[in-house]
Amino acid sequence: WKGPGKNNSALTVVRYDTLYSNWQNGQPMNKADLIYPLYFQYEWSSKINSSDLTYDPEFAAQAEVALKYLRGTKFLNDSNVISFVDYWHFDNKEIADFASVWATSPWEVNAAIERLVKNGIFAYSRSEATVKNIEWLSLIISSHAQAIRQELEKMKTERFVPPALKDIVTVDEAIKRYDASIKWITEHNHAIIGNGPYEIKNYNPTGSVISLTAFRDSSYPFVKGFWSIYETAKLAKFEKVQYPKIITRGLPVAISGNVTIGGNHDSNATLTYFIFDKNNHLITRGEGKWIDDKGNFMIAINGSSTKAMSIGPNEFKLFVKSNYALRPDIYSGIFISVPNPIAKKLT
């Protein structure tokens, strides 16, 4: 790990207050689980020399897309972490998703897999498996899971702590993790140890059947039904848009209408408009105004904007996005702009 250095900066800073739970092997999550994937992204996407064993070109091609924006990560304590990124989006939730620091499997499973790949037993990617004529690793295949279990047993015997977790995980903590994952793999015959609401009970490749069971651990932070509000997306939709088809250059004009969200008249949304001339050059843009909480809106376009319009057709686009779902509804219309007879007479 390297320090931030001097005079480094980032466009965006995101702080996460992490909700931990137990892994499905019974071990509580901690920051070591979050740190290991960070290490892995950098280690396996960078090639020091031609004999570098911790490099996968297919993985690197995917990881580098995000890594070029990541400036650093800082853990304030075990569950509070700050991510520094050179990334911006008009929706803060998109930034939070982009910069997230999370783990989908325990660090000890990832470390065991890494050792197996470095030793040429498996490959992380399909392309490397083909090039090296070895198997492409899958956590759900029984023989692969047993290889991971055997590697975990070696790590326990060696009292191994990954270099990336030095001074973060003690030997005793590591052995406790190894024991838990060894037991899990022995009992379940696969190595998919998650932290979500469902766990894989068994897998029958011959019958193409996977059986899931609910993970009812008391540490899981979301009660039953917590996510039900997302079963039906509350998308915004233009129900009615009214505007004059023919307008006079230099005179104000208004667009009005109504929006529904999830089928109900609601104003909990963002409304944006854009107006273009006949050459598709942007004339003006702005935010619409909600008249009430029933989805009725008004867009006032001043005379300066209409004066900049082309004689003839000018296109406008309306975008409405509910605050419950990101996908916008789009409405397009045409203003036919005609000269102002008074202004023409004065000239």
What are these regions (language model features)?
Residues 1-347:
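The feature preferentially marks the first beta-strand/turn patch immediately downstream
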